[in-house]
């Protein structure tokens, strides 16, 4: 950069040149926004410009060694313009127009994760834009909007800016190549390439990629055909449409999902956008109620009846968004956190042995019960998999209530086992069958399999972060289960009701425990990631008198001192290494394996597992007691960690016992409740306590 050393009256010429690196010049109240062209015409003469206050320039411009190569520069001074040989046109700064003025109420959503980002009112205002400026810059030199669909977040912990842009879409060049390939392979003429562009835009407007969710291939193609019909477009065939989708959403996979005899091909990793108008169609609401099955197939259970025609539904869809539509969109977003690919296992056959059936009940009726109960359980899985919990009550009422099945007429079986829809079982036969002990035991075993599958669908990983809205919905669902089933089976014998409610109580209690465990995991994750808290915890733990703890606990637990010392050292070492929550979970799993290894394959394995839980809880309570007496600064953190580790130990042990006994965890937790769920069998229990609330304590107390 060159300056004139003359006085204020002498003219001077100044030229700006890009160089290596330097911070940008702070903008003054008077600025000129300059856009540089790629190159200057040959022979162009640079005109000198007089500067009225040239003696002040060295102090302002001397530190600058670089002008950012983004071809946008800020110049200081009054009416002066610093010219550059590479700059063709200068534009004056206009303070009137405003670009994207942020406010405290503005919110943006990132499509893949759904995290909400609120732009604070204290964010720096955006630089007004000019219609001929290629890219708008803020004071720091970063682009405010660099591409369609990207948002800039001002400010943060590290004063950095993050661009929220969906990265899984194909680039324009890739889309052009995809169109060319389709034209060559499918023989599509060039005049139809414009139609392909409109199809691509429709896909980008209505669908997005997301992990852990799926969409039936046929449903997506039906949406496409409806779009072409509404806009009078010529659709491509299904194979070409599949190639088109894979060219837009890179890495898309295909899976065959569903129960046996009713599985469908799904695109795995794609979903409808929550704000897509396709969500508002009544047909799509019914798709989600039936795992988003295609229109041409008859669903096993259709919870919502169609009230309006397709034309009426589509014509009014853009006017109002009903609560049902909002809930459907939210459920579809939550589906990425559950296991929608879970395959429902087979049921065992009832073992009748030499038991004589009651009068009027035949093996023909038993076969019909197997078919209708399997169909009923599959419908339950479909509804839960789509998070439509309120339909469970209607399902149970339709199966058990007297209004749903007539006592008149004979039992009928379908023409083939692949089509269980034709099976019919009158209500009086259903009651008679449930009063048969082998049938009741078989139904309880089926319920254990069903509810364990539902737990694995709703909570596939107890430590994985999930939205609080989904957790609360699951807890509300668990709270209603016992009342729904009792009401639906009001006409059945008390023994049948107690058996059924005993299993569903264990299911509800499992959902409550797992959601509580998940909540503790998210709270503890923040503690384990805080270095200062970890250091304080380690300092407080080193002050605990573990020798005194061992002396007091040895009389009760009778544990080997070497085992206790090894656990103490491993715990301190893991804490000192600032391990993550997943690493702590692996350590706890290894502790359970080491302690129960000597009891593997032994009939005493369940008792040894329960004893280990009691001893673990007693030792941890003694350590917390010592920390409390010493007024440890990290007592709150230790209390949270202790709650999490106790719950996770319970989770690990119940799964080890289930594996050792060949049962499901639901069956292990509900073994006492399955015998009887009445309060008469629970002396000392508080009035009004549900069987599910007694499940955990009863299982631990069973030491024989």
Curated annotation (Swiss-Prot):
Residues 10-20, 307-334 have a biased composition (Low complexity). SUPFAM superfamilies: Winged helix' DNA-binding domain. The modification Phosphoserine is found at residues 28, 416. It is found in: Nucleus; Cytoplasm. Belongs to the RFX family. Keywords: Cilium biogenesis/degradation, Cytoplasm, Differentiation, DNA-binding, Nucleus, Phosphoprotein, Spermatogenesis, Transcription, Transcription regulation. PANTHER family: DNA-BINDING PROTEIN RFX2, RFX TRANSCRIPTION FACTOR FAMILY. Residues 1-39, 292-334 are annotated as: Disordered. Transcription factor that acts as a key regulator of spermatogenesis. Acts by regulating expression of genes required for the haploid phase during spermiogenesis, such as genes required for cilium assembly and function. Recognizes and binds the X-box, a regulatory motif with DNA sequence 5'-GTNRCC(0-3N)RGYAAC-3' present on promoters. Probably activates transcription of the testis-specific histone gene H1-6. This is DNA-binding protein RFX2. It comes from the Eukaryota. Pfam families: BCD_RFX, RFX1_trans_act, RFX_DNA_binding. Residues 199-274 bind DNA. The gene is RFX2. One of its GO terms (molecular function) is DNA-binding transcription factor activity, RNA polymerase II-specific. GO terms for biological process: acrosome assembly; cilium assembly; regulation of transcription by RNA polymerase II; spermatid development. Homodimer; probably only forms homodimers in testis. Heterodimer; heterodimerizes with RFX1 and RFX3. One of its GO terms (cellular component) is cytoplasm.
